[in-house]
Amino acid sequence: MRDWVYGFFMAWGMFLAIPCPKKLWSETARRKMLVCLPLVGLLVGGIWAGAWLLVRGAPGPVRAAVCAAVPWLVTGFMHLDGYMDVCDAVLARRDLPTRRRILKDSHCGAFAVICLVLLALGQWSLFLSAESIVWQALLLI
């Protein structure tokens, strides 16, 4: 049982920006951590749903902005950095070694910024239009 608790807190500490109540690492619980990842996803989804409930009475654009931002904030923008790196490299239209160099570069290029803006606008508009189809939108989450 202890390995399951350790595994959950290890997954939490690794994939969420929310401070973990217990900073644990156990090699024996490492496999349990992988099994606990869906629980961490449910935690993110629960926070997301809670944020949506908190802003129910707010104007539509505010609700949409909060719903688009919450998963990024909760996960510490984890996957967003990789998304931007890939957009920078793929859209550069260069040879393979140059693309690899772009992937390793810590600076943010124009393609990354453009793709981030398009992603944010797409999510915002999805949540803005989802107010009339709330239950269908919740099924997507």
PLM feature spans:
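C-terminal ends of transmembrane helices
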Residues: 19-24, 78, 97-98
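Membrane-proximal soluble regions of multi-pass membrane proteins
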Residues: 1-25
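Short alpha-helical scaffolding segments that buttress acidic/His motifs in well-ordered protein cores
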Residues: 11-15, 69, 103, 114
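Multi-pass membrane catalytic core of lipid/isoprenoid biosynthesis enzymes
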Residues: 30-48, 89-140
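Short helix-capping/hinge motifs at transmembrane helix termini and TM-loop junctions
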Residues: 17-21, 56, 131
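A short, glycine- and basic residue-enriched loop/turn
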Residues: 27-28, 81
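Membrane-embedded alpha-helical segments that form the functional core of polytopic membrane enzymes
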Residues: 35-87, 135-140
